[in-house]
Amino acid sequence: MILCGDSVAGNSTGEMFRVTTFGSSHGPAVGAVIDGCPAGLELSEDDIQQELNRRRPGTGALTTPRAESDRVEILSGIFRGRTDGTPIAGIVRNLDADSKSYSNIKNTPRPGHGDYTWRARFRNYDYRGGGRGSGRVTIGHVIGGAVAKKLIGNYGLTVTGHVVQVGDVKADTVSLKRIGEYAESNPVRCADPRAARQMEKVILDARSRGDSVGGVVEVVVLGAPPGLGDPVFSKLDADMARALMGIGSVKGVEIGMGFEVAEHRASEINDEFYLDDDGKVRTTTNTSGGILGGISSGMPITARIAVKPTPSISVPQKTVDLERMEETTIEVRGRHDPCICPRVVPVAEAAVAIVLADHMIRAGFIHPTYIGNE
């Protein structure tokens, strides 16, 4: 059956700053094309590489042992060390793909993965390592996000992520300054050292049992001006939620206080306005997470995402052999993360940065074609 609109166009995000990702876990390469970045932005492979290094696997006991260097190659869009206004293409070649362990899942979908649904949607699909649905494709997110971060950084915006929960271990609330200073000081990427130690124990325990564990990642934006966002379906928080839900294993998004607002009265959580010492409008609290009516208020923007446990586990699970159409069991082999939250942090930052870059251009805070007076 052929349906109207039966095409796939879900590999791109953004209107004026547009990022398209491509590639699969065990294909030749993964990457991104960024269209709409103004000319004149200083940009090098190192700017992108430092972000990719934060996402890179094989860096410790808390991540998959898949040892990829993840070296980025910029193919276009840069001239004499600056963007030239044309599409920026960046790729990372897959060098350590091991497809042997995936032959047994061709007809037996792994519980928690998209194997069955992708097969139902596309019939012919790359099942190795999750294919296009693998976490490895988030390299494209990070490439696009690195460019976006560099762009909005020129205008005073910073995007910082950290892990606030792993399993049932929750971090204490810390200052925005502490997040920036301490989140990268431990392998869990948690700004609360006490909680970080407990989180690490939980992750290692899950790994020892052939299991995995989920958690919560928070992203904080500082320096965003008031006025970012469009009605009604292009609200800033709507676009942020869409971008964050585009990350594999993300099952929920909160902006500001999120679902907790349901427990309160308006008199308890309304963010009241005042004038600061510089005469700028601020709010006494920030339960809205820096966004009111879908438009940024000038206060810090906060978002949280719920990340499910990595579904690839060696614990026996029930499934169906789709070739024989009979029930069976499966134990997933291969190299997998016992908790992907630490590696999701730079991906979540990238997703938010891409949305901010797009809205900064759309709202007129960044010229759409060039930076500076040259």
UniProtKB/Swiss-Prot annotation:
It holds the Pfam family Chorismate_synt. Pathway: Metabolic intermediate biosynthesis; chorismate biosynthesis; chorismate from D-erythrose 4-phosphate and phosphoenolpyruvate: step 7/7. It comes from the Archaea. Belongs to the chorismate synthase family. It catalyses: 5-O-(1-carboxyvinyl)-3-phosphoshikimate = chorismate + phosphate. NADP(+) binds at residue 55. Gene3D superfamilies: Chorismate synthase AroC. Its cofactor is FMNH2. This is Chorismate synthase. One of its GO terms (molecular function) is chorismate synthase activity. Keywords: Amino-acid biosynthesis, Aromatic amino acid biosynthesis, FAD, Flavoprotein, FMN, Lyase, NADP. FMN binds at residues 132-134, 293, 308-312, 335. Its EC number is 4.2.3.5. The keyword NADP applies. Reduced FMN (FMNH(2)). Signal peptide: none annotated. One of its GO terms (biological process) is chorismate biosynthetic process. SUPFAM superfamilies: Chorismate synthase, AroC. One of its GO terms (cellular component) is cytosol. This reaction introduces a second double bond into the aromatic ring system.
